[in-house]
Amino acid sequence: MSKQFDVLVIGAGPGGYIAAIRAGQLGLNVACCEGNPYDDPKGEARLGGTCLNVGCIPSKALLASSEEFENVQHHLGDHGITVGDVKVDVAKMLKRKDDIVGKMTKGIEFLFRKNKVTLLKGYGKFVGKSAEGFQVDVAGEVVTAKQVIIATGSKARHLPGIKVDNDLVSDNEGALKFPAVPKKLGVIGAGVIGLELGSVWRRLGSDVTVLEALPAFLGAADEGVAKEAQKQLTKQGLKFSLGVNVNEVTTGKNGVTVKYTDKDGKAQTLEVDRLIVSVGRVPNTDNLGLDAVGLAADQRGFIEVDDHCATKVPGLWAIGDVVRGPMLAHKAEDEGVAVAERIAGQKPHIDYNCVPWVIYTFPEIAWVGKTEAQLKAEGREYKAGQFPFMANGRALGMGHADGFVKMLADAKTDEILGVHIVAANASDLIAEAVVAMEFKAASEDIGRVCHPHPSMSEVMREAALAVDKRQLNM
């Protein structure tokens, strides 16, 4: 007789492992299967998904290391500190990154044991459905579950005609383990991954050129934020070419040649040592056997779900990158918790308008809610308040005075509709805005909250006060 569970989670990325842990906390008999070994030396399945193994966590480790190098080289002098010759040990830097990843994967294994989650090593594939539940093959063993949560995540999108070998031409995985700093680096795609990885290698010494098909930089972000971010990144040495069309990519003994047409229609050639292709991601739904349970992905590979992440098949759920909405780890985590609680009979709710976005360049870029362009398109009247970090004592003392906070509020009710930040610690500052918006706060609420002084968080308060043109320190 096959193993039987109340809940089976397919995929142990941020959405999947969090869903499994929450289901375990709620007293459900839960299992989670994962088959991807990533770079495990023994070839065994590793927990954490793309985010932990080849995405969010390792990239932030390298971003931190490269920021330290940048600071020593270019900013310690401002503090009266003189250093000698500074060198980069890429191998040691990569080992630090790998050690962090290993520590966190072991942490998830511990959390599974703590919450009585059964770990099944192997890819999950539906093979049928019976009165007992859904039947899923995991590494040759068929298990049965009354409820199944699909959390298989996504993979890098590859462009037709461009062979990604993760050597000379890399996606996000290969770009995290260059054995040496490339002299010249090309990046196709000025999205989150392209900007972050381009920043890492630029700080370490690469001459980085970013090619972007769209005519505008960071089109999803607030226009003012995008302009400020592009200005700061350009000042740091990143080169941008927007509105381009990549025609051909070839590799040879001297590196990579990219032929493209620029925004003016002129043919251009870019010669680089390595190339990163970061043009989005596609859902991992290819080999799930969805037809065996009466389900199918759409033309783009996404699984259709309702507002509660339920599919059209009762008892079958899907979360994270395989469903609608932004491909963000924290969005997947929230969906995982919500689905586990709904299976247990609770009635959770996710406000997708309050899901924050962060790009971990320097300065960081973060936002939540609506942009000015979106509010104008909706015909909604709003007020805007903006305050710069250059007027903040803590930011000046830290040498992080670039950027600003912009707050948008309803013209009549004063409800906060969006907050947009360019700042050294925007990823931390945005959390206050998320909490405020979850509780339908007004800009006046933030303006009347006492913020610690001196701190960069004061700029959030000043931006709130600026909504009614009553900022105090400008």
Curated annotation (Swiss-Prot):
Positions contributing to FAD binding: 34-51, 60, 124, 321, 329
Positions with a binding annotation for NAD(+): 189-193, 212, 246, 278-281
Keyword flag Disulfide bond: yes
Keywords: Cytoplasm, Disulfide bond, FAD, Flavoprotein, NAD, Oxidoreductase, Redox-active center
Domain of life: Bacteria
Subcellular location: Cytoplasm
Cysteines paired by S-S bonds: 51-56
Cofactor: FAD
Cofactor note: Binds 1 FAD per subunit.
EC number: 1.8.1.4
InterPro entries linked to this entry: Class-I_Pyr_Nuc-Dis_Oxidored, FAD/NAD-bd_sf, FAD/NAD-binding_dom, FAD/NAD-linked_Rdtase_dimer_sf, Lipoamide_DH, Pyr_nuc-diS_OxRdtase, Pyr_nucl-diS_OxRdtase_dimer, Pyr_OxRdtase_I_AS
BP terms from Gene Ontology: 2-oxoglutarate metabolic process
Main location: cytoplasm
Similarity section: Belongs to the class-I pyridine nucleotide-disulfide oxidoreductase family.
Function: The branched-chain alpha-keto dehydrogenase complex catalyzes the overall conversion of alpha-keto acids to acyl-CoA and CO(2). It contains multiple copies of 3 enzymatic components: branched-chain alpha-keto acid decarboxylase (E1), lipoamide acyltransferase (E2) and lipoamide dehydrogenase (E3).
Note: The active site is a redox-active disulfide bond.
Protein's name in the database: Dihydrolipoyl dehydrogenase
Species for this entry: Cupriavidus necator (strain ATCC 17699 / DSM 428 / KCTC 22496 / NCIMB 10442 / H16 / Stanier 337)
